[in-house]
Protein backbone atom coordinates (compact mmCIF):
# COMPACT_ATOMS: atom_id res chain seq x y z
CA UNK A 1 0.00 0.00 0.00
CA UNK A 2 2.84 2.40 0.72
CA UNK A 3 4.11 2.05 -2.81
CA UNK A 4 0.80 3.30 -4.25
CA UNK A 5 0.51 6.15 -1.76
CA UNK A 6 3.96 7.39 -2.79
CA UNK A 7 3.05 7.22 -6.49
CA UNK A 8 -0.17 9.12 -5.80
CA UNK A 9 1.77 11.86 -3.98
CA UNK A 10 4.19 12.22 -6.89
CA UNK A 11 1.29 12.42 -9.34
CA UNK A 12 -0.38 15.15 -7.28
CA UNK A 13 2.85 17.16 -7.17
CA UNK A 14 3.40 16.83 -10.91
CA UNK A 15 -0.18 17.67 -11.85
CA UNK A 16 -0.56 20.60 -9.48
CA UNK A 17 2.79 22.27 -10.11
CA UNK A 18 2.23 25.26 -12.41
CA UNK A 19 4.08 25.16 -15.71
CA UNK A 20 6.03 28.22 -16.76
CA UNK A 21 6.67 28.77 -20.44
CA UNK A 22 9.67 30.94 -21.19
CA UNK A 23 10.33 31.57 -24.84
CA UNK A 24 12.56 34.15 -26.42
CA UNK A 25 10.49 36.65 -28.37
CA UNK A 26 13.28 37.40 -30.83
CA UNK A 27 12.78 35.76 -34.21
CA UNK A 28 14.85 32.71 -35.06
CA UNK A 29 17.23 33.85 -37.79
CA UNK A 30 18.78 31.67 -40.43
CA UNK A 31 20.41 34.08 -42.88
CA UNK A 32 17.63 34.92 -45.29
CA UNK A 33 14.77 33.51 -43.15
CA UNK A 34 13.31 34.80 -39.86
CA UNK A 35 10.68 32.76 -38.04
CA UNK A 36 8.85 34.77 -35.39
CA UNK A 37 7.12 33.55 -32.23
CA UNK A 38 3.48 32.69 -32.71
CA UNK A 39 0.97 34.94 -31.01
CA UNK A 40 -0.80 34.68 -28.76
CA UNK A 41 1.35 32.09 -26.98
CA UNK A 42 0.02 30.16 -25.15
CA UNK A 43 -3.17 30.12 -27.21
CA UNK A 44 -6.65 28.66 -27.47
CA UNK A 45 -8.06 28.04 -30.01
CA UNK A 46 -6.15 29.83 -32.82
CA UNK A 47 -2.78 31.46 -33.42
CA UNK A 48 -0.81 33.49 -35.97
CA UNK A 49 2.74 32.59 -37.02
CA UNK A 50 4.80 35.45 -38.49
CA UNK A 51 7.82 34.95 -40.73
CA UNK A 52 10.05 37.12 -42.90
CA UNK A 53 12.03 36.24 -45.99
CA UNK A 54 14.96 38.27 -47.26
CA UNK A 55 14.36 40.09 -50.53
CA UNK A 56 17.50 38.27 -51.76
CA UNK A 57 15.35 35.15 -52.13
CA UNK A 58 13.18 37.00 -54.69
CA UNK A 59 15.94 38.54 -56.85
CA UNK A 60 15.89 37.99 -60.60
CA UNK A 61 12.27 36.83 -60.49
CA UNK A 62 12.96 33.86 -58.23
CA UNK A 63 10.15 32.57 -56.02
CA UNK A 64 11.13 30.60 -52.90
CA UNK A 65 9.26 27.38 -52.16
CA UNK A 66 7.81 27.57 -48.64
CA UNK A 67 6.13 25.07 -46.31
CA UNK A 68 4.99 25.46 -42.71
CA UNK A 69 4.15 22.40 -40.63
CA UNK A 70 3.02 21.86 -37.06
CA UNK A 71 4.07 18.72 -35.17
CA UNK A 72 3.19 17.32 -31.76
CA UNK A 73 5.82 16.04 -29.31
CA UNK A 74 5.58 12.59 -30.93
CA UNK A 75 6.76 14.17 -34.23
CA UNK A 76 3.36 13.51 -35.83
CA UNK A 77 2.21 16.02 -38.40
CA UNK A 78 -0.74 17.84 -36.84
CA UNK A 79 -1.49 20.63 -39.32
CA UNK A 80 -0.37 22.76 -42.23
CA UNK A 81 -1.38 26.36 -41.47
CA UNK A 82 -2.85 28.68 -44.09
CA UNK A 83 -1.06 31.70 -45.50
CA UNK A 84 -3.05 34.67 -44.19
CA UNK A 85 -2.57 36.70 -47.35
CA UNK A 86 -4.31 34.09 -49.54
CA UNK A 87 -5.86 31.43 -47.29
CA UNK A 88 -3.82 28.82 -49.16
CA UNK A 89 -2.25 25.96 -47.14
CA UNK A 90 1.50 26.59 -46.81
CA UNK A 91 2.60 23.34 -48.40
CA UNK A 92 5.31 23.76 -51.05
CA UNK A 93 3.98 27.16 -52.10
CA UNK A 94 5.98 29.52 -54.31
CA UNK A 95 5.70 32.97 -52.71
CA UNK A 96 5.89 36.40 -54.32
CA UNK A 97 7.28 39.51 -52.63
CA UNK A 98 5.43 42.58 -53.82
CA UNK A 99 6.42 45.08 -51.12
CA UNK A 100 9.79 44.43 -49.40
CA UNK A 101 10.44 46.53 -46.29
CA UNK A 102 13.91 46.89 -44.83
CA UNK A 103 15.26 44.13 -47.02
CA UNK A 104 12.57 41.63 -45.97
CA UNK A 105 9.17 40.47 -47.15
CA UNK A 106 6.73 39.83 -44.31
CA UNK A 107 4.24 36.98 -44.22
CA UNK A 108 2.03 35.31 -41.64
CA UNK A 109 0.21 32.03 -41.33
CA UNK A 110 -2.93 31.15 -39.39
CA UNK A 111 -3.68 27.92 -37.53
CA UNK A 112 -7.19 27.32 -36.20
CA UNK A 113 -5.99 24.76 -33.63
CA UNK A 114 -7.45 21.72 -35.42
CA UNK A 115 -5.81 18.60 -36.73
CA UNK A 116 -5.27 18.61 -40.48
CA UNK A 117 -8.42 17.76 -42.49
CA UNK A 118 -10.41 17.23 -39.28
CA UNK A 119 -12.69 18.93 -36.79
CA UNK A 120 -10.63 17.42 -33.96
CA UNK A 121 -9.03 20.11 -31.80
CA UNK A 122 -5.40 19.86 -30.80
CA UNK A 123 -4.92 18.80 -27.18
CA UNK A 124 -3.22 21.02 -24.62
CA UNK A 125 0.54 20.77 -24.81
CA UNK A 126 3.70 21.79 -26.60
CA UNK A 127 3.82 21.80 -30.40
CA UNK A 128 6.68 22.53 -32.80
CA UNK A 129 6.17 24.59 -35.92
CA UNK A 130 8.71 24.24 -38.69
CA UNK A 131 9.23 26.64 -41.58
CA UNK A 132 10.92 25.17 -44.65
CA UNK A 133 12.21 27.60 -47.29
CA UNK A 134 13.99 26.09 -50.30
CA UNK A 135 14.88 23.09 -48.11
CA UNK A 136 16.21 25.21 -45.21
CA UNK A 137 14.44 24.35 -41.93
CA UNK A 138 13.77 26.64 -38.95
CA UNK A 139 11.67 25.63 -35.93
CA UNK A 140 10.07 27.09 -32.80
CA UNK A 141 7.80 25.88 -30.01
CA UNK A 142 4.30 26.96 -29.06
CA UNK A 143 1.83 26.00 -26.36
CA UNK A 144 -1.85 25.11 -26.68
CA UNK A 145 -3.88 25.54 -23.47
CA UNK A 146 -7.48 24.49 -22.87
Predicted regions and their residues:
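Glycine-centered coil/turn sites that cap beta-strands in beta-rich domains
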Residues: 25-39, 43-69, 83
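Short, surface-exposed loop/turn motifs with a glycine/proline- and acidic-biased composition
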Residues: 87-134
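C-terminal tail/sorting-segment detector
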Residues: 22-26, 35-36, 120, 124-146
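Terminal processing/anchoring signals of secreted or surface-associated proteins
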Residues: 38-41, 51, 75, 111, ...
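Hydrophobic beta-strand positions in extracellular immunoglobulin-like domains
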Residues: 53-55, 113, 133, 144
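Short, compositionally biased serine/threonine- and acidic-rich segments at solvent-exposed termini, linkers
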Residues: 2-30, 80, 89
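A short acidic/small-residue loop/turn micro-motif
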Residues: 83-90, 146
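Beta-strand signatures of extracellular beta-sandwich domains
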Residues: 67-71, 76-77
